[in-house]
A protein has these predicted regions:
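N-terminal presequence-like segments and the immediate start of the first folded domain
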Residues: 1-71, 75-89, 94-156
Length: 156
């Protein structure tokens, strides 16, 4: 029987209590990712340690946030043995709907074989005032559900 397996990508870059991704059989369930750079993650860690207000990403250029979000998503997928082209479905949250065109122009450059099914919506205020957050469901190439063989219900 398939079981839930955390993807070994380290702790959440924000220190929040969640796994960046978990695998169930060949499926990956990827938590919402945003443009957290190592420097921004360090600032979050320092703020939490000192009791200071958490930093905001609002001052970072939107295009930069999108590129960093996609790189973070790539890193998590790679840690599980997958790539962006393995994404089956993505949900994109934008702080401002006016950024949709710029988001789409950048997003499309990260895929080589197909575009995943996708929902894009305006979400109002996102964590750390980021302009974009993306969650995804993907698959790991070469993996099958445990117990799935010829004639089994899972292989049909």
């Amino acid at each position: 029987m398939a079981r839930l397996v955390p993807v070994p990508v380290g702790d959440s870059p924000t220190g929040a209590p969640y796994s960046p991704a978990v695998r169930f059989g060949p499926l990956l369930f990827v938590s919402g990712h945003f443009g957290t750079s190592p420097e921004f993650a360090r600032r979050i860690e320092e703020a939490r340690a000192t009791g200071e207000p958490l930093p905001s990403m609002a001052e970072l250029p939107f295009d930069e946030q999108v590129h960093q979000t996609m790189r973070n998503l790539q890193g998590t997928l790679a840690a599980a043995g997958a790539s962006l082209d393995c994404i089956l479905q993505a949900t994109v949250y934008l702080r401002r709907q006016e950024d949709a065109g710029r988001f789409d122009a950048i997003y499309r450059t990260y895929f080589t074989s197909h575009f995943p099914a996708r929902t894009r919506l305006q979400a109002g205020r996102l964590p750390f005032d980021t302009g974009v957050e993306i969650e995804a469901i993907a698959y790991v190439p070469g993996l099958a559900f445990e117990g799935a063989g010829a004639g089994s219900e899972e292989s049909r």
